Amino acid sequence: MKKKIKIIGAGPTGLITALNIVNKSDFEVELFDAQETVGGLAASVNIDGMICDWGPHIFHSAHRDITDFWLKNFGDLLVKKDFFYKNYKDGIYYDYPISWESINKFPKNIKKKVEKEINNLKPENLMRARNFKECVVELVGPTLQKIFFEKYTEKLWGLSPEKMSPNWAPKRIELRKKHKAFWSGQFSACGKYGAGAIMDRMAKTIQEKGGKIHTKHRLKKINIIKNKISDLHFENGKNYKSDDSIVVSTIPLNNLCKTMKLPCDLMFNSVRLMYMVFSKNRIFPKNTHSIYFAHSSFDFHRASEQKQYSDTTFPKGKSIIVFEISYTQRKHLGTMSDKELSKRILKQFCSLGFVKKEDFLSAQSVKMPNVNPVMKIGYEKELSKINSKISKVDNLHLAGGSAEFIYGDIQTMVARGNDMADLLISNHYAINKNLKRSLQFKFNENVEIYGHKIGLNHPTMVIAEIGINHRGNLEAAKKLVLEAKKSGCEIAKIQTYKGKDRVSNTSKEAKYADKTLGMEETT
C-alpha cells in the first residue's frame, strides 16, 4: 500500500514538501488550502493587469543547492538583480541596513556619540540581554537603537521592544562601510510575473505527477483517536479520513491549535496591504525598491514600488506602491474601509513629496492576520507546552515558519520543505530520532559516555551546558569548566566554531538562518 501524505496549507513550505515527495517517491500526496489560489503569503494579485506580490518577495540564498533549485525550475520566471532599501527618519533617507555612509550624515555631535558607543561595545554583554531592546543596544549602542530600531519595532509588532524576547533580536548587525545591495554577496531575484507565478508552477508540477490540490478548503476541526488523526473536517463541509495518512501542517500554529481545541496564547502580527495605483511612470528614485517608516505619523511601516522589482506587467505611465500596515495593536487600521484608509494613506504619502493627490488612480487592500510570530518575553514556555501536546499525535508533523512559530523567508521555507520531504520518504522514518514514531521501539537501557555508565541502576549524570564559543574568550570558557566541576557535574559540554559561521554552510541549520537580517542563529 502506498504511503499517504496530507499537507495542510499550500504556501511555499507545503508546495516544496509536496513537490519533493512526488519527485522522489510514489506516495499519494494531497494539499489543502483555505484560499482560492496556492502560494500562501507568497501569492500575487492582479490589479488591472499589473502583477503585485502580497508584499515583495525575494528569492535569495547563499546556498548553491537552493539557488540551483530556483534557476533550474523557475529561471524563466525570475529577474535576477540587486535590491536597495532606505530608512526614512526626520526627512532624511538613510541606508538600510545601516552603513557608515549613513552615520556620516548625522550631525557631528550625534556622529561622535555613535562612534564612541560602538567603540565601547563589549560582545560578552550580549549574552546578558534580557529583551529585544537590550540585545540591540549591545550590538549597535543606545543611540542607533533609538534612532532605527525602537519605534519601528513597536510599530511593526505592536509590542514594546522591552517586552519582546531577546530570541527575536538580531544576533549580529553588520555596519557596512558603504551602501550595498541588501543581499550583497548572495544570489537574489524576484518574480518576473510575481512570486505567485512560481507558486503556480510548483502546483502544476505536483498535479502533473499525481498529487492533488484542494483549494477553498479551510481546516475547521481535527478528530484524534488514540493519539492519531482520524479525520480532517473543513469549513466547506468536506471530510477526509486520515488514520491511514501522515498529516503535515504548515498553517499558523494558533489556527492549528484551534482545530484541535488546544488552548493557545501565541500571537502573530497582522498586516494589511494597501495597493495604490498612481499615474506616474516611476515614483521612488531609481534603485530604491522599498522604504521603511518608523514615525507614528505614518500608518504604514514599509512602502514598496512593485514596478522597480519587476516592470514586466506594468505599462508606461503607471506604477503601484504597496503599503504594509501592521494592525496587530492598531485595530482600527484593520477595520477601516478601503476608501477611508486609502484616503489617510494618500494624504500621508503626498506629504513626502513622491506623488501629488491628482496622481492617484485607485486603491484596494488585502488583510493577512497571521504573518510572523510575535515573540513576547516568555513565549518559549507556551510554545513548549503546545509542542508537547502536539508531539503526542503520532501522524502529525509541523513544517514551516508559521507552523513552527519561527521567523522564515522563502529560502528557509525551501530548506524546511526539502528536509520534511526527505524525512517522510526515508526508509528509517519509523525510528528516525527527529520524527514521531508510528511503530514502537526500545531505546538502549544503558549507554557509556567517557567512562561513565548511564541508565538503569547507575547514578544520575549531570552535564553542564556552558555555552558556545564564548565570543572567542578562552579564559571565560576555562572558568566555566572549573565552575562546572566545582558544582559536581561529571561533564562540561562546550561547542566551538571557526570563522564567521556557526556551522557548515551546507548543514541543514545553516539554511534555516537568514544571515542578512541576523534574526536566527545557527547551531
Regions found by a protein language model. Give the residues of each.
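Active-site/ligand-binding neighborhood in enzyme catalytic cores
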Residues: S102, K108-I110, V114-I225
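Mid-domain catalytic core of redox enzymes
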Residues: K24, R218-K339, K343-G353, I386, ...
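N-terminal amphipathic alpha-helix/helix-capping segment at the start of soluble metabolic enzymes
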Residues: F441-I463
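Glycine-rich, proline-tolerant flexible connector loops at the mouths of alpha/beta enzymes
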Residues: E490-T523
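Dinucleotide-binding Rossmann-like beta1-alpha1 core, especially the glycine-rich loop
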Residues: D48-E124
